[in-house]
Design a protein with these regions (language model features):
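Helix-loop junctions and terminal segments of transmembrane helices
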Residues: 28-29, 58-74, 249, 254-291, ...
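Interfacial segments at transmembrane-helix termini and the short loops linking adjacent helices
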Residues: 104-121, 305-337
Length: 483
């Protein structure tokens, strides 16, 4: 089993992130026009409800499984036993979850009225459990994960344009989304025999997993709660139209966040492995570089979403979603906030086995988000939901930075603050000037302004010899010279 370098894994995960970006980028403009805000709102509402059941079945395995597998990846016997123990726990819990879910569809009026949609959406629970994605990430098989995911997304891409034709096709669209995101779980399950030994162990130890899984479970349910409670409350209080506005803005924000956090997904298993083997110098070096990466990448994306919120919404969702513009501008701040909290939480607290603090921070955020939602959504709708989530995310970051204050020198000393500020300032000035003075089609103005925004930003960083950028360029130049 070959373990690739962090750079290779990052490249693969970035390719995966790009594919995750392209799928909604290409399909959502079409789907949003066909299904309308009401149709997309129904799908988002169903998915938010199903997500709660999925996290009960998964029981915190997403991050715990990665860490547990990364720590024993060099011992096939221990890895096989660990995977079987975790998977059996998940399968038992999934059985109970499905019983409750089906009872909900039968007896809850809001679910019963869309029975077909919720039955289809419920497949997400099964696919998530049998997919054992945490194993493949734990042993850093990002090449396999990426290629497999791209194939399934391509099939889903074809299905969207061939099967979603009218406003009543929202249930079919829900199935396609599930197929694209977690449908490959059965392929993972089939390939499992190539990675671990499928046999009975006489000394199964389920108990050792329960406490950390419970901590991760509470964390996950709190995250899902404060993320999806906004959609649920919008649906119950304001109706599907406001859900559609919020969902469109949230989708655009999510694409940006996934780009910024793509490195963190790769580093969790590697950092867990370094700590398990007392390789602290490598641990600190990667954390410093990760912080620089987040600052350099996330800040221009935040500014971009604020400056270009209107054209982004019009191009990606259409004029029916003008109500998404202000929510997107508010949610844009989350790109930077989550970038850093992903670093402090996923890349640091979990490998350091301090996941209880991650749990505390998320529970605090869930309470804050719930209270703000109840206050703001009745009056401000989607905008209020966006503000609530943004404040909740900020509270997570503040708490985690306080817990990890001993690492502040390692994290923040290498960031080129002035170079980034100068680059952003010039990019903003150029973009605003172009928007004011170019008298062309709005789409052309947007494409030109957006392109020059990033060109100016990167150009200033290069001219000012920003260390992180120059290190990457030197490594690329070195590889090209060798070849």
């Amino acid at each position: 089993m070959k373990i690739h370098s962090v750079k290779f894994n990052f490249a693969m995960n970035m390719l995966l992130t790009v594919s995750n970006f392209l799928f909604p980028l290409i399909t959502f403009p079409y789907v949003s026009r066909v299904l309308s805000p009401i149709g997309t709102g129904k799908v988002a509402f169903a998915y938010s409800i199903v997500s709660y059941f999925s996290i009960f079945a998964a029981f915190g395995v997403a991050n715990y499984g990665i860490r547990a597998c990364a720590q024993v990846r060099d011992d096939k016997e221990k890895l096989s036993k660990t995977v079987q123990e975790i998977l059996l726990i998940n399968m038992i819990l999934m059985s109970f979850v499905y019983v409750v879910y089906f009872l909900g569809i039968v007896f809850v009026p809001e679910l019963k009225v869309e029975k077909t949609l919720f039955l289809i959406s419920g497949l997400n629970i099964l696919f998530t459990i049998v997919g054992v994605e945490w194993l493949y990430k734990g042993i850093e098989q990002y090449f396999y994960i990426t290629i497999r995911s791209i194939i399934f997304k391509f099939i889903a891409f074809v299905l969207v344009f061939t099967c979603v034709k009218t406003e009543s096709d929202y249930s079919g669209y829900a199935f396609i989304i599930i197929f694209a995101t977690v449908g490959s779980g059965f392929v993972n399950l089939y390939n499992l025999r190539k990675i671990i030994t499928i046999k009975y162990f006489s000394n199964y130890d389920f108990k050792r997993h329960l406490k950390p899984m419970m901590t991760f479970f509470i964390t996950t349910i709190a995250v899902t709660f404060y993320v999806n409670v906004s959609v649920a409350l919008l649906g119950f209080i304001q109706g599907n139209e406001e859900v559609g506005y919020y969902n469109a803005a949230y989708r655009i924000k999510d694409v940006m966040v996934s780009i910024v956090t793509s490195l963190g997904a790769v580093l969790l298993p590697r950092l867990s492995y370094y700590i398990e083997n007392n390789m602290w110098d490598k641990f600190n070096d990667i954390l410093s570089k990760s912080t620089q990466f987040i600052f350099i990448l996330s800040l221009p994306l935040v500014v971009f979403c604020i400056l270009f919120a209107k054209p982004s919404v019009l191009i990606l969702a259409g004029s029916a979603y003008l109500g998404s513009i202000i929510p997107l501008q508010v949610l844009a701040l989350i790109i930077f906030i989550v970038g850093l909290s992903n670093l402090t939480g996923i890349q640091m607290l979990i490998p350091l086995k301090k996941e209880k603090y991650l749990c505390y921070s998320v529970v605090i955020a869930a309470v804050i988000n719930m209270l703000l939602n109840l206050i703001l959504i009745p009056e401000y709708g989607a905008i209020g939901a966006a503000v609530s989530v943004m404040v909740a995310e900020a509270s997570i970051l503040i708490y985690q930075i306080y817990i990890l204050r001993a690492y502040s020198q390692v994290l923040f000393s290498g960031v080129s603050y002035m170079r980034i500020i100068m680059a952003l300032a010039l990019a903003i000035i150029v973009s605003i000037w172009l928007n004011i003075n170019l008298n062309y089609n709005e789409t052309i103005v947007f494409l030109v302004s957006a392109s020059l925004f990033f060109i100016c930003y990167l150009g200033v960083l290069l001219l000012s010899k920003e260390p992180f950028i120059f290190t990457i360029l030197n490594q690329i130049r070195s590889k090209l010279t060798k070849n």
